[in-house]
Amino acid sequence: MMSQEFAHLSVLLTETVAGLNIKEDGIYIDGTFGRGGHSREVLKHLGENGRLIAIDRDPQAIAAAEQFADDARFSIVHGGFGQLATYVEDLGLKGKIDGVLLDFGVSSPQLDDAERGFSFLRDGPLDMRMDNSQGETAADWIARAEIEDMAWVFKTYGEEKNSRHIARCIAADREKTPFLRTKELADLIARISKNKERNKHPATRVFQAIRIYINSELEQIDQALEGALSVLAPHGRLSVISFHSLEDRMVKRFIRRHCQGESVPHGLPITEAEINKSRLLKGIGKAIKPSEEEVERNTRARSSVLRIAERLEY
């Protein structure tokens, strides 16, 4: 059972699961299990012959999945959602998946547990790995990264306007003392920040950028979206929650690209039917944002956006 201290509220829960248009005997993927909120809701809608396959690379999420150990309809894979298609193919289920749910947010237990190193508000080791059993930590990367590389990461993944200034200050400070704690890095950024945004900690963008880079999040998202499209059955649904503009732009462009199909040069002798074959998705409704009531209950839902699409006939 999860401790109250690290409890997690799933964002846009009702809307996301409704977007899957669940069939009682369908097969569904929760590509970002987290602490199981969305999975629990999906299971409520499945009959005894339905099936839910969850994926997560966080060992703590895998442990949390024990809550469903007695449910024969549920199984979980320890791995990144970017490998979603591979896991489904290994199970012999390619083209048979009725819905894929992806929630790209960092879970509240990850943010609130100082030992995970994601938060600039709680002091802890500067880690930030989604799977803290492998890979380079944020502290290791900051210790070795060139100024130009840091500036590029901060600007590209955090949309940080002062990326070069912050990178130079980090490089100067690490010569004296290495950055090993989240508070050390957050305090430096707060001290040197030129443009303070209202209601936003000065370190927000830099911490986001480092986390995205360390975990290859945007590459994982791209692979997950393409993978989901490749495994969905005709009329299968894709429900995707993003939390910042970089993610949402990727999802929006992905859906739009596959709704429009391939671009055909003017005058090429090709039929409308042939053009339609390249249209693989149709968008379902407009982007959905949380209600005021949900944001009041869970302030972390504020920036979330849900987009839904449906797989067309092959």
Curated annotation (Swiss-Prot):
GO terms for cellular component: cytoplasm. Its EC number is 2.1.1.199. It holds the Pfam family Methyltransf_5. InterPro entries: RsmH (IPR002903), SAM-dep_MeTrfase_MraW_recog (IPR023397), SAM-dependent_MTases_sf (IPR029063). Gene3D superfamilies: Putative methyltransferase TM0872, insert domain, Vaccinia Virus protein VP39. S-adenosyl-L-methionine binds at G36, G37, H38, D56, F81, D103, Q110. Keywords: Cytoplasm, Methyltransferase, rRNA processing, S-adenosyl-L-methionine, Transferase. Its main location: cytoplasm. One of its GO terms (biological process) is rRNA base methylation. It is found in: Cytoplasm. It catalyses: cytidine(1402) in 16S rRNA + S-adenosyl-L-methionine = N(4)-methylcytidine(1402) in 16S rRNA + S-adenosyl-L-homocysteine + H(+). It is an enzyme of class 2 (transferase). GO terms for molecular function: rRNA (cytosine-N4-)-methyltransferase activity. Specifically methylates the N4 position of cytidine in position 1402 (C1402) of 16S rRNA. Belongs to the methyltransferase superfamily. RsmH family. This is Ribosomal RNA small subunit methyltransferase H. It comes from Shewanella sediminis (strain HAW-EB3).
